[in-house]
Amino acid sequence: MSASTTATLRHDWTLAEVRALFVQPFNDLLFQAQTVHRAHFDANRVQVSTLLSIKTGACPEDCKYCPQSGHYNTGLEKEKLLEVQKVLEEAARAKAIGSTRFCMGAAWKHPSAKDMPYVLEMVKGVKAMGMETCMTLGRLDQEQTEALATAGLDYYNHNLDTSPEFYGSIITTRTYSERLQTLAYVRDAGMKICSGGILGMGESLDDRAGLLIQLANLPEHPESVPINMLVKVAGTPLENAEDVDPFDFIRMLAVARILMPKSHVRLSAGREAMNEQMQALAFFAGANSIFYGDKLLTTANPQADKDMLLFSRLGIKPEAGEGHADEVHQAAIEQALVEQQSSSMFYDAASA
């Protein structure tokens, strides 16, 4: 067994080391990743989250992959910030069918002073339901970060998207250093970090390695690392980007698992395009978190009942959330997920 499979937490990965992980034989890489995974997680448990878009469209950022950018005509109807009560109703529905974490996303460059009180009420309300809370609101200043932490926010999502070298080819309205600063504020405020990136934007292997190096070499590893496959949306500059080789995507998940042994690696956007065999490989490679429901912000996500049927076929069960380890409660969640047949409970932020 190589030194890398011992799952020692490191923050000094080099490009040469990570490149070597990527290019080794596929079976060797997956064996190594699965070995690391089993050292820290139950290999047959997957964390389940629900994501709600609380403010959709008209974002001033120019991210070339994003249908919510106001710079591109994608046909997405913009919406104002959802009312707090509506958000809490959706959180209650998500909890009722088994989600343990509720993530709220807003298409902002950064939250405004007038919106922050409503955002904080959302956090407090969802937290009061006994769910883990997560938000993605764009860039934060230190005061906003501390306010979110005080309100009870558990996780803050702020993706790095790609390597520092390729970043300028995708986004010009926010710097890489600004993203890193937001992550530093989040960590200093005592919240957990959710940060990852996207494959399929024209990046090189070294860019993929570079993204993971940035994340793994942070002072503390992100607790959650979402790995997204580009969802090509008409009207965005990347609508005709070349498809990602499925094996290359699985390699990305496996290397993320090896570099960040204790982090949840999330199989995130793009799952709609993955067949069941590819998703099963993703779980074997160390992915142990998914978004559950019909929409991932504004792009399609596999239907909830299909997810649970696949879980059943693979012998996978949903992971209990923090503070939700009671066996009776967990059994009820698992049964509700298996029996769930309708996805009508989930709010489609793009169709309101």
UniProtKB/Swiss-Prot annotation:
Cofactor comment text: Binds 1 [4Fe-4S] cluster. The cluster is coordinated with 3 cysteines and an exchangeable S-adenosyl-L-methionine. Binds 1 [2Fe-2S] cluster. The cluster is coordinated with 3 cysteines and 1 arginine.
- Residues bound to [4Fe-4S] cluster: 59, 63, 66
The answer on whether this UniProt entry bears the keyword Metal-binding reads: yes
| Organism, as annotated | Pseudomonas syringae pv. syringae (strain B728a)
Q: Which GO terms of type biological process are on file?
A: biotin biosynthetic process
Domain of life from the UniProt record: Bacteria
Report domain Radical SAM core positions: 44-262
- Which Enzyme Commission number(s) are on file for it? 2.8.1.6
The record, for SMART domains, names: BATS, Elp3
The UniProt function text for this chain reads: Catalyzes the conversion of dethiobiotin (DTB) to biotin by the insertion of a sulfur atom into dethiobiotin via a radical-based mechanism.
Q: What is an example of a GO molecular function annotated in this UniProt entry? A: biotin synthase activity
Task: Give the UniProt family note.
Answer: Belongs to the radical SAM superfamily. Biotin synthase family.
InterPro entries xref list: Aldolase_TIM, BATS_dom, Biotin_synth/BioAB, Biotin_synthase, Elp3/MiaA/NifB-like_rSAM, rSAM
Q: Keywords, A to Z?
A: 2Fe-2S, 4Fe-4S, Biotin biosynthesis, Iron, Iron-sulfur, Metal-binding, S-adenosyl-L-methionine, Transferase
Q: Which reaction does it catalyse?
A: (4R,5S)-dethiobiotin + (sulfur carrier)-SH + 2 reduced [2Fe-2S]-[ferredoxin] + 2 S-adenosyl-L-methionine = (sulfur carrier)-H + biotin + 2 5'-deoxyadenosine + 2 L-methionine + 2 oxidized [2Fe-2S]-[ferredoxin]
Pathway where it operates: Cofactor biosynthesis; biotin biosynthesis; biotin from 7,8-diaminononanoate: step 2/2
| Assembly notes | Homodimer.
Which PROSITE patterns does the record match to this protein?
Answer: RADICAL_SAM
Names of required cofactors: [4Fe-4S] cluster; [2Fe-2S] cluster
Q: What is this protein called?
A: Biotin synthase
- Gene3D superfamilies attached to this UniProt entry: Aldolase class I
